[in-house]
Amino acid sequence: PFAVINADDYYGKEAFVKIHEFLVENYTPEKSKELCMAGFILGNTLSDNGTVTRGICAVDENDYLTDVVETYEIKKTSDGAESQGNRIDVNAHVSMNMWGLTPEFVGLLEEGFVEFFENIKGDEAKELKGEYLLPIYIDELLKKGTVSVRLLETQDKWFGVTYKEDKPV
């Protein structure tokens, strides 16, 4: 098993420890479609310098993901956060693209990529700018019942370099 992260984000130690422990303690070939994701608290992941995109997560009573909704243009406000005029709970769990995956998942990812590529073929704009987004694909697999994803809550504070102002001087 392995972890996948964004290259321009700092996630914090707790998130790495939780992903590692889950993969070490839970992975077997029989459980190859049981994945995990670090669930950050939205308020710990907002930039002071502009908007961000986050996967807003819904979980069941056992902390398994039931839904991930990519939410664009989330900005900090004086009393919380909003996206395109809609308030968002700053205590909501969000995906920061820190996933614990299995070798068997790579085959599913490949199948999905072939389908994605076939769907954009012939559309020049999509061929040049289309993105195969991991959270969206994992959400599709969740909805089909192909995989399960355990949300591992972390209190870590994220910071990234989305904006040049995010980088410390």
Regions flagged by a language model, labelled:
Residues 10-12, 158:
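Short, active-site-adjacent cap segments at secondary-structure transitions
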Residues 2-10:
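Short beta-strand-to-loop acidic/aromatic patch adjacent to the donor-nucleotide binding site
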Residues 7, 40, 154:
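Cofactor-binding loop segments of dinucleotide-utilizing enzymes, especially the Rossmann-like FAD-
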Residues 4, 37-38, 151:
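Structural beta-sheet core signal
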Residues 1, 24-30, 116-120:
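Alpha-helix termini
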Residues 12-99, 103:
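Conserved core of the sugar-phosphate nucleotidyltransferase
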Residues 59-61, 68-169:
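Conserved alpha/beta core of the MobA/IspD/sugar-nucleotide pyrophosphorylase nucleotidyltransferase superfamily
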